[in-house]
Amino acid sequence: MKIKTAEFVGSAFNESQYPKDKIPQIAIVGKSNVGKSTLINTVLGRKNLAKVSSTPGKTRGINFYLVNRAFYIVDLPGYGYAKVSKEMKKQWAYNIETFLNTSKNLKHALLLIDIRREPTEDDFMMVNWFSFKNLPFSVVLTKADKVNKSEANKAIENICRSFNISSDRVIVFSAVEKTGISEILRIFEEVIEK
């Protein structure tokens, strides 16, 4: 797939602000600071489409990016960040849950996990939710340039065992080394062909 156009459409803080069209959506979910914005920019070949921050918890609303006028990438707020108020955490959880429960156009989710970390309780909750909703998902192990090949293979095995999924649903991604991009683009392609 060639990325011809990619535009930020807007941030939604409640259901009334979601796009009203029937264009398929792919959600990007994961902990704060796992590299969601970096992945979006890298895969779409755009430098600053999604704002990258070293401060976790930067994405507060649900951000919609329209790609090739054919599908949306939906960037959900990162979860599990300790330094925000309980109130803010509740609001984020509510925003994520509302979107996941109400979107009629959600076709696939990419769950991002730092390749150097164990999956969190929140990651397991997301996987359970995907399974419950019969939503196809893939796990993207980010920051792969920080580990060697054998550590990467161990991380893949661990994810497959933890989530009871096959290795073809795990993508090893590095924005630095530009690995995993073609696999992610293939998922985008499959979604719009369905």
Swiss-Prot record:
Superkingdom of the source species: Bacteria
Annotated positions binding GTP: 30-37, 57-61, 75-78, 142-145, 173-175
Binding annotation for Mg(2+): 37, 59
PROSITE patterns given in the database record: G_ENGB
Role, per record: Necessary for normal cell division and for the maintenance of normal septation.
GO cellular component, one term: cytosol
Organism for this UniProt entry: Caldanaerobacter subterraneus subsp. tengcongensis (strain DSM 15242 / JCM 11007 / NBRC 100824 / MB4)
Protein name as annotated: Probable GTP-binding protein EngB
GO biological process: division septum assembly
Matching HAMAP family: GTPase_EngB
Cofactor: Mg(2+)
